[in-house]
């Protein structure tokens, strides 16, 4: 059952993703000719997926967590490949690397290490 502590961990994971996504939008990474895939909603969902993966790891459901993390990573890789297919795109993978870091911070928050995840988000 989802208790208040787990909900707080998941909420932290979503807030981390949301903060990173808002920063990416504000700095112009999602707009223009070289716009990337991730905005506030995308990064919030990636943080939530990571949070759920961390929660499943706490419940000893490592396979479910691995599927969630692998699926999020495949999504990021597919977005990068799609961006590189555009003829006017310069090679840059900053947004994609940050997306994978957001998933990792979500996992950290989902495991219960909210302070560590939040401090890492402040550095990103």
Regions found by a protein language model. Give the residues of each.
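Structural signature of hydrophobic alpha-helical transmembrane segments
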Residues: 3-17, 54-73, 113-123
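N-terminal signal-anchor module of multipass membrane proteins
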Residues: 1-36
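Hydrophobic, lipid-facing residues on alpha-helical transmembrane segments of integral membrane proteins
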Residues: 11, 15-19, 44-48, 52, ...
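Cytoplasmic-side transmembrane-helix entry/capping segments in multi-pass membrane proteins
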Residues: 32-45, 64-70, 86-101, 118-121
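C-terminal ends of transmembrane helices
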Residues: 18-32, 72-91, 124
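Hydrophobic alpha-helical transmembrane segments and adjacent interfacial helices
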Residues: 49-58, 74-83, 99-113
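Membrane-interface module
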Residues: 20-28, 94-97, 108-124
């Amino acid at each position: 059952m989802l208790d208040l502590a787990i909900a707080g961990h998941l909420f932290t994971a979503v807030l981390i993703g949301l903060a990173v996504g808002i920063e990416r939008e504000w700095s112009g990474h999602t707009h223009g000719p070289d716009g990337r895939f991730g905005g506030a909603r995308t990064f919030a969902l990636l943080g939530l997926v990571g949070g759920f993966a961390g929660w499943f790891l706490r419940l000893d459901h490592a396979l479910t967590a691995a599927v969630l993390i692998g699926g999020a990573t495949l999504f990021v890789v597919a977005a990068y490949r799609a961006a590189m297919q555009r003829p006017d795109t310069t090679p840059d993978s900053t947004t994609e690397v940050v997306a994978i870091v957001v998933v990792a911070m979500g996992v950290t928050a989902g495991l219960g290490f909210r302070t560590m995840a939040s401090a890492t988000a402040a550095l990103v």
